[in-house]
Amino acid sequence: IAERDPGLLDPTLGAGSEALGFIGIASLVAWGFGYPGQPHVLARFMAIKSPDYMAKARRVAMSWVIIVLAAAIVVGLTGVFAVPGLVGAESEKVFILMSTTYLHPVLAGVCLSGIMAAIMSTAAAQILVASSALTQDIYRGLFRSSSHGKELLWVGRGAVLSIAVLAFWLALDPERTVLDLVAWAWAGFGSAFGPAIVLSLYWPRITRNGALAGMIVGGATVMLWKQGSGELFQLYEMIPGVLFSTLAIVLVSTFERRAD
């Protein structure tokens, strides 16, 4: 592997053995900021049977993450020789090609089913959480507090269909890889909801309007940063999104409490 591309074994080097630099390293580290803002992840915390299970859940989750990410690295490095010549978006097919090329059809089918299971599990969780938020928090909470039963059921179904169609439309962009889409969505959720969630837990002075301002500013920053050009805008949009969202929450909450 070192003879083929030394950059594959050096965490400070990118493609073509070029140094990542501050922007590259900071962008990689920034992925961790996104976890507190993922609705489908937060739903797991909310659904836990008892806070006493948190320590056990943490051990299970971290063990699973370490195994999965380590295996992903091994698959990628093995693919350099097993299926050479994959570049750009084609490199995302390395696991599929290795499974169908080197495994028995039955085992290959199990591996491919695993991919679909992971996709469907995450997609279903995100769509259901988004549908619930649109139905209960926005439609019923802001517009029709008296709605219930079949009305909410049909609104929820419409929300599920609309979100699925929107996701399908975004996925049709031929210029983007799966990783590009995931990174953008990860930054959007992390910047919009992450700072509000964390500060709600650890900063008692946060206000309702402060949290709302943080969500709006964080989401808008990610959208606008993606449209910028130049070296500075190579920085992962998660970083400015979280930064500006946090500032918005602190400033609005502070001014609001002073006014009171």
Where are each of the predicted segments found?
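Membrane-embedded helix-loop-helix hairpins and adjacent transmembrane boundary segments
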Residues: 1-260
